[in-house]
Design a protein with these regions (language model features):
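Solvent-exposed edge beta-strands and adjacent loop segments
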Residues: 1-51, 93-105
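Mixed-charge, glycine-accented linear interaction segment located at domain edges/termini
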Residues: 2-4, 121-126, 134-142
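Short, acidic/charged, Gly/Pro-enriched secondary-structure junctions
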Residues: 8, 63-103
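Oligomerization/assembly interface segments of phage tail-like spikes and tubes
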Residues: 41-66, 112-126, 247
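Solvent-exposed loop and beta-edge segments used for protein-protein assembly and interaction
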Residues: 48-52, 79-81, 110-114, 174-176, ...
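"Short basic amphipathic alpha-helical interaction patches in structured regions
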Residues: 69-76, 115-117, 132-137
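Short beta-strand and beta-hairpin "edge-sheet" elements
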Residues: 84-128
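Intrinsically disordered, low-complexity segments enriched in serine, threonine, and glycine
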Residues: 135-268
Length: 268
């Protein structure tokens, strides 16, 4: 399935365009080292996961050369729209890949069919869960085995001040790079605080706010908002990140507190 700017569709057409193989490159872990005179070996200075490739192979069937040309032209329009988009495939139905097409090649050509190989770069170096944490958790098409989901009742809406937020992905969620939306409601006389004890991150909203008066504080990626209006000047300008696994969260200086945590898991 393809998701191009919200338009979701299957590029396959029965007896005409058929995906016959999906190959995903293994994670690429790049490590750089520094060497110091007089010491043994090298010291790791930098390490990161690098972009990898996703390759889809299609068979196309046609009646003649004119029919073939029409199909190939149509596939050019589909696969190379000129912007990044998401690909989901049946081998990992609970994950999606944000891709850029980099190669479109006819690898085999016959009188009535051809084989086309399309290579995509995955620049983020990760896949992400098809659904966000505020969707229901069950092993349907949106969630699958191998997504680090245990037999547990995962919650991402809370009405207590101390709780755990579980990040089932392989990577930390950093709002400077990834979508993370936190909403905070309740009654505060000032200095309402979100504290992640696991990472040490602390976000503070200094003024009073009251949900009884219709006010909600939101952290939408890197943007603090009060009822949708940017309010970063009234904060400590810090962010909340989520480490892989369990994050111990504490909400301070807010009575009758309610909070929600919406994000996607990220996988190697």
């Amino acid at each position: 399935m393809f998701n191009q700017n919200g338009k979701i569709f299957d590029p396959q057409v029965k007896d005409k365009i058929v995906c016959k193989e999906i190959k995903r490159q293994a994670p690429i872990y790049e490590v750089k080292y520094e060497e110091f005179e007089g010491t043994n070996g090298s010291r790791e200075s930098y390490a990161s996961f690098r972009p990898f490739e996703l390759v889809l192979t299609f068979d196309i069937f046609y009646k003649n050369e004119y029919d073939k040309e029409l199909i190939v032209s149509e596939l050019h329009q589909i696969f190379i729209p000129g912007f990044q988009y998401y690909v989901t495939h049946e081998l990992s139905p609970g994950k999606r890949f944000r891709v850029n097409p980099v190669n479109f090649e006819l690898t085999e050509e016959e009188n009535d069919y051809s084989t086309i190989e399309i290579t995509f770069d995955v620049p983020s170096a990760c896949s992400e869960s098809l659904s966000t944490t505020l969707s229901e958790f069950n092993l349907s098409n949106e969630w699958q085995f191998s997504q680090n989901l245990e037999a547990a009742d995962y919650k991402y809406s809370f009405d207590v001040s101390r709780f755990q937020v579980f990040n089932a992905g392989d990577f930390a969620i950093d709002p400077r790079e990834h979508a993370l939306k936190i909403t905070l409601q309740g009654e505060s006389l000032g200095n309402g605080t979100i504290f992640n004890r696991t990472t040490g991150d602390r976000f503070i909203y200094y003024p009073e706010f009251s949900t009884n008066l219709g006010q909600t504080v939101t952290l939408d990626r890197v943007y603090p908002k009060l009822n949708g209006v940017h309010c970063g000047i009234n904060t400590n300008l810090e962010l909340i990140t989520l480490a892989p696994g369990i994050n111990e969260i504490e909400i301070q200086n807010v009575a009758n507190v309610k909070s929600t945590w919406d994000f996607r898991y990220l996988y190697k």
